[in-house]
Amino acid sequence: MEQSNRQTAEPAIRSAETVDSTINSFQETDLKVQEKEDVAAAVQTESASIDSNEQGQSVSANTNTQSQAKKLSNNSHQEPMQMVSAANKERAVLETAQNQKNGNMINLTTDKAVYQAGEAVHLNLTLNNTTSLAQNITATAEVYSLENKLKTLQYTKYLLPNESYTTQKGEFVIPANSLANNRGYLLKVNISDSQNNILEQGNRAIAVEDDWRTFPRYAAIGGSQKDNNSVLTKNLPDYYRELEQMKNMNINSYFFYDVYKSATNPFPNVPKFDQSWNWWSHSQVETDAVKALVNRVHQTGAVAMLYNMILAQNANETAVLPDTEYIYNYETGGYGQNGQVMTYSIDDKPLQYYYNPLSKSWQNYISNAMAQAMKNGGFDGWQGDTIGDNRVLSHNQKDSRDIAHSFMLSDVYAEFLNKMKEKLPQYYLTLNDVNGENISKLANSKQDVIYNELWPFGTSALGNRPQESYGDLKARVDQVRQATGKSLIVGAYMEEPKFDDNRVPLNGAARDVLASATYQTDAVLLTTAAIAAAGGYHMSLAALANPNDGGGVGVLETAYYPTQSLKVSKELNRKNYHYQQFITAYENLLRDKVENDSAEPQTFTANGRQLSQDALGINGDQVWTYAKKGNDFRTIQLLNLMGITSDWKNEDGYENNKTPDEQTNLLVTYPLTGVSMAEADRIAKQVYLTSPDDWLQSSMISLATQIKTNENGDPVLYIQVPRLTLWDMIYINETIKPETPKVPEQPQHPARTLEPAIPQTPEAVSPLPVANKQAVDENKNEIVSALTGEENDLQLPTLSKRSLSISQAELPQTGDNNETRSNLLKVIGAGALLIGAAGLLSLIKGRKKD
C-alpha cells in the first residue's frame, strides 16, 4: 500500500530551525488591518442542544464584527498572506468566543434528505422577531460549493414583536436546475432584522445525487426494546421522529434489520408475523408498520434495503430443499463436526443451517423468495449477510478428507452475488463481508455498494496485526477504494458493553451501562471521522424507537441492532448532526475519486515540537496527519489523538478517556515536490480549512501560508492552522482561477436596499394595540428574491494578528450570474443615456455658437 512505508522527510523541512523560523515569521510580521463593518462571522461557536421535542435540527451560532488583514509578501520565496497572532493571544480569542455563545437557534429543515438533479430544494425554517419593533425579518441563504458561493436567496416577512412565522413549501426554494448532480453543497443561513443585525444563524448541507451508490450514507432501522425488539405500529411516532432527524442528517439509504419472518420466507404478505426463531425475545413484526417506514424513507428520497442472510435456513422451520443442497463442514469447529451440515448455534442451540451457494436449486429458491419479499414490502434492494467464512464441502464430497475437494465459502461469494444480480436486476444488492478480508475475491462481483462489518479481532489490511486502531479502519477503506473504486460502508459498532450470564460486567462499557451512562461522545465521533476522512462512511446511526436515544437518533453498539443499552446524549446527537452535514457538504473532497497522496505532511506546535508521528494512524498521542488527492485538489487530514489511545472501539468506555487535548496555532508543512516556485506561489493563495467541530460547523476558512524551499530547492508549503478539536481538513485547490472583473458602483448587499411594502414601525413607548393586529397582518410585506453573482463574495474567516478576531477573506464566486448581468445592463444602459445626453447638449451648444 502507498502509505505502508513512509519515506524520510527532507532534513530541511523537518529541521527545528526551519520550523522555528517559519513560526517566527508568522508571529512577528506587523500587519496593517483594514476594518470592515458588519461582516457576520463564518466561524460558529458551540451550539445549544437540539430540542428533542421538535423534528429537525436546531443550530445556534455566534456572530462577531470581523476584520480583514491586508496581504503582505515577506520575501521572494514567500506567499503574500494573512498572518496569525501568537498562540496565547489566539487561544484567548477562541475562549472568549466560546463564552459569548448565544441561545439563538435556527430550526432549519428540508423536504428531502437527497435530491435528484433538476429538483428544487424546499427550505423550511421559522423566522422569529425577537426584537421590540414590528419590522421585516429576513432569512438569507447562501449556497456554497466548496469555497465558491453560487447563489444567495432571501425570504422576508413582516413580523410584530415576538411574532414567529414558519415558511411553507414553495415559499423559500433553491430553484430547480440550480445545482449539479453528484455534488455536496453547504447552505449558510442567517436571519436578520431590518437593520441587518443577525438574530440567528446555522449551516446545513444539501446533496444532489441521482445515484445513492456514489456517496452512500447508510443507517439502520430495527426493532424497539420497549416491545421485545418488535416493529409495531404503535411505535411509529417514535420512528418517524428519528427518521425526520435522519432526513435532516442527509441519510440516503436504510438497512431494515431483522424485520424478516424467517430466512427462507423473509416478508410474507400478511398483517403480522412472529419471529419464532428468536427465542430470546419472541419479537413480532407488523407488516403495515414496516411498509409505513419504507414509505417514509422513500418520501425523503432515500432507498430501503431488506436484510436477510444469503444462505440460511432457520433451524426451527421445515427445509425448503433436500439435504443434497446443504453445505458441509470440512473441519470440526465452531460450525459443528466435520461432515455435518454447517450450523450456527447460540448456547449450543442451533439457530441456522446453511445451503451451498453453488447450488442452482438454492440460487433459484432464494432469488424468488427475496423478489417476492421485496415486492411485498416495497423495498429497493437486499442487504445480504453471512455468518463468516468457513472451509466447506458439497454434499457429494461431505465425507472426504482431501482438502482439494473443499473450498472456502468466500471463494464462491462473488459467483453467488453475480447470479443473484442476474436474477434480480431491478433491485440493489450488497453483501456483508465480515472483517473485509475477502475484497480480492469480491472485487469483481456485481455489488451495488460495498459493506463491511469490522471487528478489532479481524486481520488488518496493513498486514499481520488486528484491526483495532483508527489507522486499521483507514487501511480497509483504502483497500476497498483501490480494488473497486467504491466508497466503503463500515459497520463499526461502538463500545459494545459485555456481561456474563449473571449480568456481571466484563468491560468498562458494561460498567457504564450499570451507571446509566451515555456513549462517550468523542469516542463515537473519532471513529466516524477516521472512516470519513479516509473516504468511507461509518454506519452508526439507527432508528430503534429506543428510550435510550433520549429523543435523538440511536447509535449502534453491537451486531444485534435492537440492543442499545448505552444512552445517547443530546451533545452526541447534536454533534452527529454536524458531522453528517460535513460529510455531505464535502463529499467531493472526501470520496469523489480521491486517492492517497504520496506527499508526507507534518504537524508542529507553535514552539516547533512535531506532533505527527505516524501517517498510518496506528499510534495514539499524536496529530494523525496524512494527505489525499483528487481531480485538481489535495487535502490534508488532521485527526487529533493527542493524549488518547488509538483504539477505535473503546470497549473500556469512560475508563478510557477519548477526548483529546485541543490544539491551537499549529503549523503544517506540505512538500510540493516537482512544482515550480511560481506554481507554488499560486497554489498557496488557495488553501482553506474546514471542520465539523463546533468552532466551524462546516464553514470553510482561508488560511495563512508561506512558501519556503528545502535543501533540494523544492518548494514547501507552510500552513497555519488556528485550531484542532477532533478533525480538521485542509483543502488545497490546484485549479487556475480566472480573475473576476469588478462591476463599478455595485452595492455590496443589493438585497438589503429593498424598501418594505409598509413603513417600518418606529420605536414606541407602548406596544402596538391588539386591535390593529388584523390590519397590520393584512399588509405584511413578503419578499422572496434570488440573488446571484454579487460583486462581493463571502469573506471566509482567518485570524489576524492585530485584531485577534476571526476575519473573512474574499473568495471567488461562480455560478449563474443573471443578477450581475442584469445590473451590468443597467449600468451600461445608464452610461449610454448619459453619453447620449452629453452628446445632445454638445450639439445644442454647437448650434448656438453657429
From Swiss-Prot:
Bias type Polar residues, positions: 18-28, 44-79
Region entry Disordered, spans: 1-80
Enzyme Commission code: 3.2.1.11
Positions annotated as propeptide: 815-850
Biased composition (Basic and acidic residues): 29-39
Modification type Pentaglycyl murein peptidoglycan amidated threonine: residues: T814
Membrane topology recorded in Swiss-Prot or TrEMBL: Peptidoglycan-anchor
Pfam families in alphabetical order: Glyco_hydro_66, Gram_pos_anchor
Residue ranges annotated as motif LPXTG sorting signal: 811-815
Entry keyword Amino-acid biosynthesis: no
Protein name (database record): Dextranase
Native source organism of the sequence: Streptococcus mutans serotype c (strain ATCC 700610 / UA159)
Source lineage: Bacteria, Bacillati, Bacillota, Bacilli, Lactobacillales
